[in-house]
Swiss-Prot record:
Keywords: Cell junction, Cell membrane, Membrane, Nucleus, Phosphoprotein, Repeat, SH3 domain, Tight junction. It is a peripheral membrane protein. It comes from the Eukaryota. Residues 11-93, 187-264, 369-435 form the PDZ domain. This is Tight junction protein ZO-3. The modification Phosphoserine is found at residues 128, 156, 161, 195, 313, 321, 360, 580, 835, 884-885. The keyword rRNA-binding does not apply. Residues 762-772, 796-814 have a biased composition (Acidic residues). Its main location: membrane. It comes from Canis lupus familiaris.
């Protein structure tokens, strides 16, 4: 008997356990001796017990290849799997072959190894104990076929193994041989009764059918015919028709980024004509595009995949793009085994929501078993809804005697569409609000599909809504379950119709959410206000800060000071009324953050700008550009055409990024807000001094010729930490007289550049009056700018009065006013934190920091402030009484009555 090692491929879907996680431990990787990611331990009784084994080689996790990756990357991928992990592993197995004659054993073994090679379906696997690579095995297989081409009719029994191949063992599947055409199989399904279902869910995937010799793809050599296209410019290609794909490519404007999966078997491009040619003489590619609207699982990107949620944007052309259906996983030609139970549904993070058209249900891509139900709405719909944007909207109950009763709607039906509005990507809250808003007596047309098995699994796994938001206002915690947050916090929303605090809490005012940490791990769970409630609270916060009563407002702030600050006036400057109106209009127009901003986790495709805040920012920028000029470049400032102040053009930042360099920016915190708004997402590093004396010693050691005031720099650093900490990517302490902080700074920039970041889900809509250009749209003609120092750079800066290290120390809030446009190392002492709703993110562009001028008597200002604070305090108290509750507990709402 001869012994041969083959590799079996298994796929298992694991549900995360709250205490045990996925129940596995992994080790190895490219940075280890083994080279492969291996399952090192399986927790008894965990989700993986009985499904995975110790020693399994991890091949793929949620569509992300684990071949030739580091162990850190593999662990990070598993951490980003919030609920489910679809893990594909390969497992070695030794089989015994009967001994063959000497003359045929070589050919027989070679044929067996060749068949095993063809059955792998992924790069880098070893199919025998030899450990030879795929390329070597491919060359060996091709050579073997050429040598044996003339003797196929005279094979011994051992030689027949090449023609017949290995039988399927333990669910092991082989990709079709490239030199053997598959024979088409015709299958006819006939329904005997109306209740019978075909039981087939179709899926599709865009692939590269042909590459022209004269195109860029042929010269780039990074693409091959047969490659599966997973993403086009960051948008998932799953379920996109050819027209949608063509439109997406046309919008790329000169730069096309494709994420592809290499099909080693060249299966799609080698389908025989009998299969690829349809009766209507359309190409095989057109056939696939017609089926591309069927539901299947999203294919994650090559980076840690963004969490599943839906993106909704209206397309002005009014075309309809079919949505995917929740339940089943796509059968990729590279998959080799399917488990018996269906995978939990997961939607792509880059779904496109189109305006519905007047097409029929079948034209929209719905399955043939979908049904259309029509009835007139009464006082209520009579349906109980469950699910959400992550799995779809399902019927969990029908009220007896309601208009929907008797129409054939059952528990477990998925609502695909209501009155030409697709429901596949709506949250449960949005679906309920849409149905409730329908006037009584109006005809309701529902397109439903029977998905009872998916509904049952959804209820058991307690999934529904799933998307991520970033907050842009502050809220205090309301025990026991209400979460507090500051600007910039990220939450994972799990239910958009969560009951309020206490057993009698009403639905419709709160979301169930989990706070996300800086390490992308989930933290505490609780409730937060829903979208409409958040808008009210954010408006109230803005009004409070306008009169100096809001969170974080400075002691010396007032309504009059806010009035002059919005007009971009600085001390001693005499601007015309027209100029002030233009500045205020620009601040209102250029940007506006919602209270909750939908975000996704993506990898930066460009070198992110670097903003260094703190008392050593000037020294750090000089050292970085001098030491690493090929990695860093200082963004030069230019004078305004209508004023002596200086600005930094966004086009300058773009040009530096195109050179594959980090743009070093000396800008104010308000300019950092603007950079985030235009989706540059800078790396903001704050250098925190220990004390004023330590800072003075450090600056004298780093820059002996510098005459900058250590007391002033220290006071400004304290102000930055107090009011702009939500902008910091990292904080580096300044200790002693060493360059440890500088080494940490370089390490932070390197690490943050490789980490995924929370980016806006929707692109910024540009106004025709706004010259702002986004990074992905090109900034060649941009006139957008950032605020920087408006004076000539000098080491000795007293701002018109004595301010040296020899002066006595005063409180940081009592320092003298600074000019309107200051560098990041010199923020305005009287500046108070403003939400993006207040300054429209463009305060850096117009210089919103100003001094307070005593145009009115102090008594009148105090009277105005006191009256405004008392009025708003009463309003805020009433709002907080509604928001908070002394009763404990919150509940996850699985369904909502209508």
């Amino acid at each position: 008997m001869e012994e041969l090692t083959i590799w079996e491929q298994h796929t298992a879907t694991l549900c995360r356990d709250p205490r045990r996680g996925f129940g596995i431990a992994i080790s190895g990787g490219r940075d280890r001796a083994s080279g492969s990611v291996v399952v090192s331990d399986v927790v008894p009784g965990g989700p993986a017990d009985g499904r995975l084994q110790t020693g399994d080689h991890v091949v793929m996790v949620n569509g992300v290849s684990m071949e030739s990756v580091t162990s850190t990357f593999a662990i990070q991928i598993l951490k980003t799997c919030t609920k489910l992990a679809n893990i594909t592993v390969k497992r070695p197995r030794k089989i015994q072959l009967p001994a063959t004659k000497a003359g045929t054993s070589g050919r027989g073994r070679q044929g067996l190894e060749e068949e095993a090679d063809c059955g792998q379906g992924y790069d880098g696997d070893t199919s025998s104990g030899s450990g030879r690579s795929w390329d070597k095995r491919s060359r060996r297989a091709r050579t073997g076929r050429r040598n044996q081409a003339g003797s196929r009719g005279r094979r011994s029994p051992g030689g027949n193994s090449e023609a017949n191949g290995l039988a399927l063992v333990s669910g092991f599947k082989r990709l079709p041989r490239q030199d053997v055409h598959m024979r088409p199989v015709k299958s006819v399904l006939v329904r005997r009764t109306e209740s019978e279902e075909f039981g087939v869910t179709l899926g599709s995937q865009i692939f590269i059918k042909h590459i022209t010799d004269s195109g860029l793809a042929a010269r780039n050599r990074g693409l091959q015919e047969g490659d599966l296209i997973l993403q086009i410019n960051g948008v998932s290609s799953e379920n996109l028709s050819l027209s949608d794909t063509r439109r997406l490519i046309e919008k790329s404007e000169g730069k096309l980024t494709l994420l592809v999966l290499r099909d080693r078997g060249q299966f799609l491009v080698n389908i025989p004509p009998a299969v690829s040619d349809s009766d209507s003489d359309s190409s095989f590619l057109d056939d696939i595009s017609a089926l591309g609207s069927e539901l299947s699982q999203a294919v994650p990107s090559h980076v840690p995949p963004p969490p599943p949620h839906a993106q909704r944007s209206l397309d002005s052309d009014g075309t309809d793009s079919p949505r995917d259906s929740p339940p089943l996983r796509r059968e990729n030609s590279l998959d080799s085994r399917t488990i018996s139970e269906p995978d939990a549904p997961r939607h792509s993070s880059y779904d496109i929501y189109r305006v519905p058209s007047s097409q029929s249900a079948e034209d929209r891509g719905y399955s043939p078993d979908s049904r259309v139900v029509r009835f007139h709405k009464g006082t209520t719909i009579g349906l109980r809804l469950a699910g959400g944007n992550d799995v779809g909207i399902f019927v969990s109950g029908v009220q007896e005697g309601s208009p929907a009763d008797g129409q054939g709607i059952q528990e477990g039906d998925q609502i695909l569409q209501v009155n030409d509005v697709p429901f596949r990507n709506l949250t449960r809250e949005e679906a309920v609000q849409f149905l409730v808003a329908l006037p009584p007596g109006e005809e309701v047309e529902l397109v439903t599909q029977r998905n009872e098995d998916i509904f049952r699994k959804m209820v058991q796994s307690r999934v529904g809504d799933s998307f991520y938001i970033r907050t842009h206002f502050e809220l205090e915690a309301s025990p026991p379950s209400g979460l507090g947050f500051t600007r910039g916090d990220v939450f994972h929303v799990l239910d958009t119709l969560c009951p309020g605090p206490g057993p009698s809490g009403a639905r419709g005012t709160h979301w169930l959410a989990v706070r996300m940490g800086r390490d992308l791990r989930e933290q505490e769970r609780g409730i937060i206000p829903n979208q409409s409630r958040a808008e009210q609270l954010a408006s109230l916060e803005s009004a409070q800060r306008a009169v100096g009563a809001g969170p974080g407002a400075s002691v010396g702030s007032s309504a009059r000071a806010e009035f002059w600050r919005l007009r971009g006036l600085r001390r001693g400057a005499k601007k015309s009324t027209q100029r002030s109106r233009e500045d205020l209009s620009a601040l209102t127009r250029q940007g506006h953050y919602p209270p909750y901003e939908r975000v996704v986790l993506r990898e930066a495709s460009f070198k992110r700008p670097v903003v260094i805040l703190g008392p050593v920012a000037d020294i750090a920028m000089q050292k970085l550009t001098a030491e690493m000029p090929d990695q860093f470049g200082i963004a030069d400032s230019v004078l305004r055409t209508d004023s002596p102040s200086k600005i930094i053009k966004l086009d300058t930042v773009r040009v530096i990024a195109e050179k594959n360099k980090h743009a070093l920016l000396d800008v104010t915190p308000s300019a950092v807000e603007r950079l985030n708004y235009v989706q540059y997402y800078p790396i903001v590093v704050f250098c925190a001094p220990e004390s004023r004396a330590a800072l003075k010693a450090l600056r004298q050691w780093l820059a002996p010729a510098s005459r900058r005031s250590a007391r002033r720099l220290y006071a400004q650093a304290q102000k930055l930490r107090k009011h702009s900490e939500h902008l910091f990517t990292a904080t580096i302490p300044l200790r002693g007289t060493s360059d440890t902080w500088y080494q940490e700074l370089k390490a932070v920039v390197r690490e943050q550049q490789t980490r995924p970041i929370w980016t806006a889900e929707d692109q910024l809509d540009n106004s025709s009056e706004d010259n702002l250009e986004l990074p992905h749209r090109g900034l060649a003609d941009s006139s957008a700018d950032l605020s920087c120092d408006s004076r000539v750079n000098s080491d000795y800066e007293t701002d018109g009065e004595g301010y040296t290290d020899g002066e006595g120390y005063t409180d940081v809030d009592e320092g003298p006013p600074a000019p309107a446009l200051a560098r990041s190392s010199e923020p305005v002492l009287e500046e108070e934190p403003r939400s993006p709703r207040d300054h429209g993110r463009a305060s850096g562009a117009r210089g919103a920091q100003v001094d307070r001028h005593p145009y009115h008597s102090q008594g009148r200002q105090d009277s105005m402030r006191t009256y405004g604070q008392e009025a708003l305090k009463k309003k805020f108290t009433r709002a907080r009484d509604v928001e908070s509750s002394d009763e404990d507990g919150y509940d996850w709402g699985p369904a909502t009555d209508l």
